[in-house]
Amino acid sequence: MIRRLLLIGLALLIAAPAAAAPSKIRVSLKTSEGVIVIALDMKHAPITAGNFLAYVDQKKLDGTSFYRAARAVGNPKRGFIQGGVHRDARRSLPPIAHEPTSKTGLRHLDGTISMARREPGTAMGEFFILVGAAPSMDAQPGGKGDTAGYAAFGQVVSGMPVVRRILAARTWPQGSGAMKGQLIKQQIRIIEAKRAG
């Protein structure tokens, strides 16, 4: 009888499908301005979302900051904030393969989180969050120049008022290139990054 029950139990275990990995994983960024909760899209952008999650799980984002507020010309309530390890080699993981929006199907919408990069395949621990849609950041196959766009990998699900406050932070007028006038005077600390229930 017991042997029969054990065999039935074993057969059920073998027949049961493996639990699927969640398609969305939530991450909480506790900042000096408040909490931002992000849903990472593990299904559509597994490499990029997995990379961000590695930074979270290894505590590499704890103690970093949001250091850039890039406000749109003519509409300072739109733009993006950028944060992360800011070229700190001790915190950086190896670069990842680029996942363009033309492959993932994701778009750069209000609240989208995406990876900052130089060339495709150089993204590591720098990311940005949009305030307002920015379709120009999506991949533009068939265009001229760098048409790969940026790798969107999730969406803010709570804390957009915090993101907007960071975007409105005072910036230095100095800087060079694209960063001119965008570096935050008093950087917004990322106190803790962790998985959220």
Stretch-by-stretch model annotation:
Residues A18-G197:
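Cyclophilin-like peptidyl-prolyl cis-trans isomerases
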Residues L7-A15:
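Bacterial N-terminal signal peptides
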Residues M1-L6:
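Bacterial N-terminal signal peptides that target proteins for export
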